[in-house]
């Protein structure tokens, strides 16, 4: 089965991450999906932006015009991203914080069919809410939380996340590639959870994971490299 290749925040080696230009380039480079982050502004707009704050001011406390002014960028709204990508590529939409799960999914469903996007998050509760209200939406738990308050407890819950996954009824898991140890992939297979690994940028690792039948897909900043390696791998397998 062909691995799914997901452009991490668009083609960010060509254009600034999470911009319309980066997303357009990812489409042209034949990515299968685009991954991006969604937050809500003070004036209730959904914007595509990774960081929690700008100049120490939380995104949730800023209006849209201020965000663009502070970043010196045309930060895209979710509406703009969907209009650009609709019918051209599927979306991997990461919800960054709690409190607007139902609103954002309802908004997305105004434009997209249920099979045209997935929702991912580090936050168990957000995914639980979405699955309860929208059972047909595919959800995925992201593992590999940066700078956790309790590193040991957090890492153990990420290396052995399957009880969490059952509780919130996710469809797949998205571990950081460094978590693929101590039998992680074997356990995921036992629990019948597809694995989408992030963020895989080294050519050696991309090749390794493309060849691993236990991995369903890769999230990468190097989408052009990954697409080419996948094509080469498929040609190799067609040779007599």
Where are these regions (language model features)?
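Phosphate-group recognition and catalysis centered on beta-loop-alpha active-site segments
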Residues: 1-240
């Amino acid at each position: 089965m062909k691995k799914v290749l997901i452009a991490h925040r668009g083609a960010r080696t060509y254009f600034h991450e999470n911009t319309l230009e980066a997303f357009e380039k990812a489409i042209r480079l034949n990515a299968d999906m685009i991954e991006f982050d969604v937050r809500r502004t003070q004036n209730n707009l959904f914007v595509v932006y990774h960081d929690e704050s700008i100049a120490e001011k939380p995104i949730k406390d800023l209006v849209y015009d201020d965000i663009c002014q502070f970043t010196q960028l045309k930060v895209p709204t979710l509406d703009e991203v969907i209009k650009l990508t609709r019918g051209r590529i599927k979306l991997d939409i990461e919800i960054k914080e709690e409190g607007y799960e139902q609103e954002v999914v309802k908004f997305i469903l105004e434009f997209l069919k249920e099979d045209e996007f997935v929702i991912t998050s580090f936050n168990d509760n957000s995914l639980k809410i979405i699955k309860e209200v929208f059972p047909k939406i595919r959800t995925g738990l992201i593992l590999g939380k940066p700078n956790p308050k309790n590193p040991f407890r957090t890492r153990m819950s990420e290396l052995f996340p399957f009880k969490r996954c059952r509780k919130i009824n996710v469809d797949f898991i998205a571990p950081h590639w460094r978590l693929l140890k101590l039998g992680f992939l074997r356990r995921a297979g036992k629990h019948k959870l597809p694995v989408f690994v992030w963020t895989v940028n080294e050519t050696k690792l991309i090749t390794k994971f493309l060849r691993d039948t236990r991995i369903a897909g890769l999230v990468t900043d190097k989408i052009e490299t990954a697409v080419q390696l996948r094509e080469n791998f498929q040609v190799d397998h067609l040779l007599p």
